[in-house]
Amino acid sequence: MPKKIFLLLFSLSIGIAAHAQSLYSDSVYNKYLDFNLARLQGEQDKVLELGEALLPFADKLPEKARINFYFSVGKMYEDNDEHSKALPFYEKVALATPNYYVVHRALGYLYLEKAKGIESQLGASTASDTTINHQLTLAYTEAVRKALPHLEKAQACDPSDETLAIIKTLYKNIKDDQGLNTLDSRLKELGKNCVDILDDK
């Protein structure tokens, strides 16, 4: 008899815990919906507040909703000129949905911005600063190499003369003739699988 009572109590506690978990997940999803509504209505201050409040609980969202949320948070930070905060969220989205070219465009241009900052420092340094110039050249090349794959995916899926010109210029700047010469074949291959809208259901 005590064994049956124990099993009954154990089953009840599992049921209550499962119900509480379900309510908790529903609450997180409702906060996600509130965040999206604020975004759609252009309430920037509210978007930032709701987005940052939801971040610690994002892992409770369904996978597709979580990926969509991360993209929206990246966009939120990018629009707020907090690019270093946007990058990790965009990177998560690119990792989860590698064919979603919109996130690649965002990443490509954010990394390009970093490369341009380094390029400006290079232009401002004197020729006698060989050590500094060497370090800046390495940093510039690294930033360009981060930007290029993202810009190429965006170009392959949504061609733009401006993006193509930037890609070609970057290859010339880092003196990568092989990368430049094989660009067309890479773009053709990258263009085979393109996603332009994230589904959150």
Which residues does each predicted region cover?
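TPR alpha-solenoid repeat register
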Residues: 69, 103, 163-164
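Short coil/linker segments at helix-helix boundaries
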Residues: 113-153
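Short coil/turn linking the two alpha-helices of tandem helical-hairpin repeats
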Residues: 40, 62, 75-81, 108, ...
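Short coil turns that delineate tetratricopeptide repeat
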Residues: 97-98, 157-159, 192
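N-terminal leader/linker segments that initiate helical-solenoid repeat arrays
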Residues: 19-57, 64
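Structural register within alpha-helical repeat arrays
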Residues: 34, 73, 107, 114, ...
